[in-house]
Amino acid sequence: MMTQPHIPSVMSDLRQDIVQMPKVIKECSGIRIYGRRIRSILFTTDVSIIANHDADAILAVYPFTPIPAIIKSIMIVASVPVLAGVGGGLTTGVRSANMSLLSESEGAYAVVVNGPTTVETIKEINK
């Protein structure tokens, strides 16, 4: 029987109150994006939470028209991959495509579109 190796842990008084994912999440297979295994995804746009968590990725979608400043702010504080919302509901076409380009240039791992996204918008994003 193999014993679990001891893994040293470093914390400080200033960063001890972080949003922690359930330990059982480490038992799932997860998904691999660009060679990085992601088991836990934190769904938030709150930059204070994005800066203080132990999730493997951030899902940053919100019910408003995507704004470059919000995506930039999230990307600045995120220390893990970000999956960025770029519209698809009311925000479509060239605007969604431009937000996708901005998200990619800021370092987002992927973009996320809403359910009612049209095929034309997907094609525009894919260009």
Predicted regions: what is each one?
Residues 2-84, 88-127:
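Alpha/beta enzyme core
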